Design a protein with these regions (language model features):
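PLP-dependent enzyme catalytic core of the Aspartate aminotransferase-like
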Residues: 2, 57, 61-65, 69, ...
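Conserved N-terminal alpha-helix of the aminotransferase class I/II PLP-enzyme fold
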Residues: 61-109
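Active-site C-terminal subdomain of aminotransferase-like
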Residues: 200-203, 210, 215-320, 330
């Protein structure tokens, strides 16, 4: 009998032949600067745990206390009986932190982006979107069935031209960008985009997943970083990266949040966060405000490691943040570099097409606030040794 799914196995074999097949690495310890993967202790440069909060004592204690008091789950979606006092307290905490009227928490950052874009727009509306926006934004745009207009990466003039072309046409306009782009580590041109949105009456939305806890005062994100409070209508963030736990959120006006309560499908049809998650997220925002030295250490480590990679002869692209790619070109080369690094005690993930464009494959590195200079020096030594052996060292780009 023919297997109707046989083509899946054929595709997997093709990826293996091309050297782009990826096996899941298994974490066998805490997610820390040095961690154990697949039975091997390595320097971890593949985690989004920017500030080391996954193991912070205050978050651990908050999770344990919430579990003791409320149990391990809510038992329902938010709109039936799954809204706990902890969920409301977390949303109010985030809203104060972000200086907005209200906030709603989603089960993931992906759900927050996709669910929000799909909820607030209709097929009669228009979306103007950066070509390198996150997959969750792209999927949300598709789900909305709105008309999608893509502009070249960070080209504010092109974005404004596209908005101008839509002036007078039926439907609403949404202008959307990442705050920090997850593959290249560059910062979105939010001031110019905000001006364009205001000029043409568009909704302005930013995905701050990789800038929450990284940019702005105490990690408030790109809106704070650029001083644009009150001028960005929809702010999306994550609780899974610098916050160190799980989930995503949307911030904005009270009307926006109440609308999402009624129309955002991931919110409507997913069980709410466990009490431990909500409580530990609240503790994380306290840490952001009370331990700003963590963010300073993150940036000190970022500058040190980025400078070391460039000095060794690696192409780190246009990175401006802790996300630092080592661009090598072909996907096979990126995966070979990642595998060789792991064998020598460094975990950094190889990334190729379709996550990044053809010919722009890279090994993505992220340093954290908890890496020591000794660990970073060891990682740089391994990168230089492996890069030389594989013949991928290049001159610094102009």
């Amino acid at each position: 009998m023919n297997d109707p799914l046989a083509y899946l196995g054929e595709q997997l074999e093709a990826w293996k032949r091309a050297g782009t097949y990826q096996r899941l690495r298994v974490l066998e310890s805490e997610s820390a600067a040095e961690a154990r993967f697949d039975g091997k202790d390595v320097i971890n440069l593949a985690s989004n745990n920017y500030l080391g909060l996954t193991t912070h004592p205050r978050l651990r204690e908050a999770a344990l206390e919430a579990t003791r008091r409320y149990g391990v789950g809510s038992g329902a979606v938010r709109t039936i009986s799954g809204t706990m006092s902890l969920h409301i307290a977390l949303e109010e905490r985030i809203a104060r932190f972000k200086n907005v009227e209200a906030c709603v928490v989603f089960q993931s950052g992906f759900a927050a982006n996709a669910g929000t874009v799909a909820a607030v727009l209709t097929p009669e509306d228009h979306i103007v979107s950066d070509e390198l926006n996150h997959a969750s934004i792209i999927d949300g745009c598709r789900l909305s069935r709105a008309k999608i207009h893509v502009f070249p990466h960070k080209d504010t003039a092109s974005a404004e031209r596209k908005l101008a072309e839509l002036d007078g046409q039926p439907g609403r306009k949404l202008l959307i960008t990442d705050g920090v782009f997850s593959m290249d580590g560059d910062i979105g041109p939010l001031p110019g985009l905000v001006q364009a949105a205001e000029k043409h009456g568009a909704i302005m939305m930013v995905d701050d997943a990789h800038s929450s806890g990284v940019l702005g005062r105490n990690g408030r994100g790109t809106v704070d970083h650029f001083g644009l409070h009150g001028r960005v209508h929809i702010q999306v963030g994550t609780l899974s990266k610098a916050i160190g736990v799980l989930g995503g959120y949307v911030c904005g006006s009270r009307a926006l949040i109440e609308f999402l309560y009624h129309r955002a499908r991931p919110f409507l049809f997913s069980t709410s966060h466990p009490p431990a998650v909500a409580a530990s997220c609240m503790a994380a925002f306290d840490v952001l405000e009370q331990e700003p030295e963590r963010i300073q250490k993150l940036w000190d480590n970022t500058r040190y490691f980025k400078q070391g990679l460039r000095a060794a002869g690696f192409n780190t692209g246009v990175s401006e943040t802790p996300i630092t790619p080592v661009i090598v070109g072909e996907a096979r080369t990126a995966h070979a570099l990642s595998a060789a690094l792991f064998e020598e005690g460094v975990l950094a993930t190889g990334i190729g097409f379709p996550t990044v464009p053809e010919g722009k494959a890279r090994v993505r590195t992220i340093v954290t606030a908890t890496h020591t200079l000794e660990e970073l020096d060891r990682a740089l030594e391994v990168f230089a040794r492996v890069g030389k052996r594989l013949g991928i060292l290049v001159c610094r780009p102009d």
